[in-house]
Amino acid sequence: MLNSFKLSLQYILPKLWLTRLAGWGASKRAGWLTKLVIDLFVKYYKVDMTEAQKPDTASYRTFNDFFVRPLRDDVRPLNTDPNILVMPADGVISQLGRIEEDKILQAKGHNYSLEALLAGNYLMADKFRNGTFVTTYLSPRDYHRVHMPCNGILREMIYVPGDLFSVNHLTAQNVPNLFARNERVICLFDTEFGPMAQILVGATIVGSIETVWAGTITPPREGIIKRWTWPEGEHEGSVALLKGQEMGRFKLGSTVINLFAPGKVNLIASLASLSVTKIGQPLATSTETFVAPEVEPAPLPAEEIKAEHDASPLVDNKKDDT
């Protein structure tokens, strides 16, 4: 009964206006009130401020400044093995595995369309059919900048307008094609592991999605698909990003989906749904290495895993925040 009510709210509530209101409030300088809100947020979600470059909450002028806070250089060591792709975001893995032709796993027993996720771009979808995907959810407590899993040359970016459903266990189980319906920014890269897509998905109260090469992509929300292209690596105007380099950020929210071409990478065997992710840790290995490296993500303290799961609405019977 309660879940039915919560699900009904996803369709009834004015999600766009709530998102605009959240974005407006998060960008305002409110002095002591801003600090109070940040302090309450840190306490409620158990945010580890010792990792931040500026651990004092009084140093943030707005909530957005706090939300996209940079981390100290030493807290996310980068695995530099050239055969290894690394995790692009702090968070929890929602789902991962093989793309079955056009089907990507959204939740147990529920799939969505690869081509729909890519805004009907069948040529791009053809690059990833029967490939590999990883969906990472960033909870409110997480660092909200997104980094590169490997070196890449940006070739295409597509902004896709859409709904702003919350991303949580309930919606993943009950909203068909959730990630293919929500607002998103699709980034296509050429890499040494073949084509790779890194998709930043919005949700309720995700105030904005930004990239390092183009700044704020949304808002404004104009309701039309926008597409940009870039030349190959050696040409003037090309955009090259290094493994571990920041490529984008969320101001509130949400989800990152990675797509890899078939036969190019093997996901780290120990990773599964609800695995906790940390930027720079091993995500996958190349299939073309002569000797497969024996790598596993660094073990995390039990209290860190518990705090991440407590903050993640992907975990059933937990909070259903965005």
From Swiss-Prot:
<dbReference type="Pfam" id="PF02666">
    <property type="entry name" value="PS_Dcarbxylase"/>
</dbReference>
<feature type="active site" description="Charge relay system; for autoendoproteolytic cleavage activity">
    <location>
        <position position="90"/>
    </location>
</feature>
<comment type="pathway">
    <text>Phospholipid metabolism; phosphatidylethanolamine biosynthesis; phosphatidylethanolamine from CDP-diacylglycerol: step 2/2.</text>
</comment>
<keyword id="KW-1003">Cell membrane</keyword>
<feature type="modified residue" description="Pyruvic acid (Ser); by autocatalysis">
    <location>
        <position position="254"/>
    </location>
</feature>
<keyword id="KW-0472">Membrane</keyword>
<comment type="similarity">
    <text>Belongs to the phosphatidylserine decarboxylase family. PSD-B subfamily. Prokaryotic type I sub-subfamily.</text>
</comment>
<dbReference type="InterPro" id="IPR033178">
    <property type="entry name" value="PSD_type1_pro"/>
</dbReference>
<keyword id="KW-1208">Phospholipid metabolism</keyword>
<dbReference type="InterPro" id="IPR003817">
    <property type="entry name" value="PS_Dcarbxylase"/>
</dbReference>
<feature type="active site" description="Charge relay system; for autoendoproteolytic cleavage activity">
    <location>
        <position position="147"/>
    </location>
</feature>
<comment type="subunit">
    <text>Heterodimer of a large membrane-associated beta subunit and a small pyruvoyl-containing alpha subunit.</text>
</comment>
<feature type="region of interest" description="Disordered">
    <location>
        <begin position="296"/>
        <end position="322"/>
    </location>
</feature>
<keyword id="KW-0210">Decarboxylase</keyword>
<feature type="active site" description="Schiff-base intermediate with substrate; via pyruvic acid; for decarboxylase activity">
    <location>
        <position position="254"/>
    </location>
</feature>
<feature type="site" description="Cleavage (non-hydrolytic); by autocatalysis">
    <location>
        <begin position="253"/>
        <end position="254"/>
    </location>
</feature>
<dbReference type="GO" id="GO:0005886">
    <property type="term" value="C:plasma membrane"/>
</dbReference>
<feature type="active site" description="Charge relay system; for autoendoproteolytic cleavage activity">
    <location>
        <position position="254"/>
    </location>
</feature>
<keyword id="KW-0444">Lipid biosynthesis</keyword>
<protein>
    <recommendedName>
        <fullName>Phosphatidylserine decarboxylase proenzyme</fullName>
        <ecNumber>4.1.1.65</ecNumber>
    </recommendedName>
</protein>
<dbReference type="InterPro" id="IPR033177">
    <property type="entry name" value="PSD-B"/>
</dbReference>
<keyword id="KW-0594">Phospholipid biosynthesis</keyword>
<keyword id="KW-0443">Lipid metabolism</keyword>
<keyword id="KW-0456">Lyase</keyword>
<dbReference type="GO" id="GO:0006646">
    <property type="term" value="P:phosphatidylethanolamine biosynthetic process"/>
</dbReference>
<keyword id="KW-0865">Zymogen</keyword>
<dbReference type="GO" id="GO:0004609">
    <property type="term" value="F:phosphatidylserine decarboxylase activity"/>
</dbReference>
<feature type="compositionally biased region" description="Basic and acidic residues">
    <location>
        <begin position="303"/>
        <end position="322"/>
    </location>
</feature>
<comment type="function">
    <text>Catalyzes the formation of phosphatidylethanolamine (PtdEtn) from phosphatidylserine (PtdSer).</text>
</comment>
<keyword id="KW-0670">Pyruvate</keyword>
